[in-house]
Design a protein with these regions (language model features):
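N-terminal lobe/hinge region of extracytoplasmic solute-binding protein
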Residues: 1-22, 26, 52, 120
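Gly/Pro-rich hinge or "lid" segments in bacterial periplasmic/extracellular proteins
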Residues: 4-5, 96-150, 154, 162-164, ...
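Residue-level recognition of beta-strand termini and adjacent short loop/turns
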Residues: 22, 75-77, 132
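Short, well-ordered beta-strand elements
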Residues: 25-28, 47-50, 81-83, 123-126, ...
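Surface-exposed binding/hinge segments that line
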Residues: 29, 35, 63-106
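Sec-exported extracytoplasmic/periplasmic mature domains
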Residues: 32-35, 52-59, 88, 97, ...
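Extracellular/periplasmic solute-recognition and catalytic clefts
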Residues: 54, 72, 128-137, 156-198
């Protein structure tokens, strides 16, 4: 995955760095003890399913453009997934971060629409609720055993599409961070002791 602040890749579900078997074959070993937010283990079947649903032309996924170099994905065993590429691709490991691994057993049970309304992942925060055009709420997932566990119990993302509203929320300390700082507001925020990075 990519670290949200530094944008540097790190091992999220992988237990070790990707292993290059030959020019067009890579293997990924899953991290021991990784679970989804419903407590079920993350399996190689989930990884294969997650990639195949994006690569399936019938699904018309926009994410396919980021992994169009992948020919096929298969489970070697219960811990190792093998990727066959159409051609050698130096950014293979970085592009894997574009695909989020989802629990096949949940989507099979409830369907894609219900899953989209209440997604289940495997990261340090689990989905709690969402209010359209308002906010998304997450809470720490205690069993998470990855590199970056949650540092707070709860996190709310305010969905502020208006740039002026985002800046006002940041200035008033209603928010602790914001994205897409308008260029014209950078100096004003810095003058109010706000840290601005690009």
């Amino acid at each position: 995955d990519l670290h949200p602040a530094t944008r540097e890749p790190y091992l999220a579900l992988a237990g070790k760095e990707p292993e290059q078997v030959d020019e067009t074959t890579w293997r990924i070993t899953l991290r021991e003890g990784a679970t989804f937010h419903d407590g079920a283990p993350v399996t190689t079947e989930d990884v294969v399913y997650s990639f195949n649903r994006i690569m399936d032309p019938a699904n018309k996924s926009l994410f396919v453009m980021f992994i169009d170099f992948i020919e096929s994905v298969k489970a070697v065993d219960d811990k190792v997934v093998e990727f066959k590429l159409k051609y050698p691709f130096a950014l293979f490991a970085n592009r894997l971060t574009c695909v989020k691994i989802v629990p096949k057993h949940v989507i099979d049970k409830v369907g894609q629409s219900a899953f989209d309304a209440h997604p289940i992942g495997s990261g340090p925060f689990k989905f709690v609720s969402a209010v359209k055009d308002d906010k998304i709420v997450f809470e720490a997932y205690e069993p998470y055993n990855g590199k970056y566990p949650a540092q707070v119990e709860k996190m709310s993302w305010l969905l502020l599409s208006d740039a002026a509203a985002r800046v006002t929320a940041q200035e008033s300390k209603r928010t602790q961070a914001m994205e897409s700082v308008p260029y014209l507001d950078i100096s004003r925020l810095k003058n109010k002791k706000q840290q601005v990075q690009s």
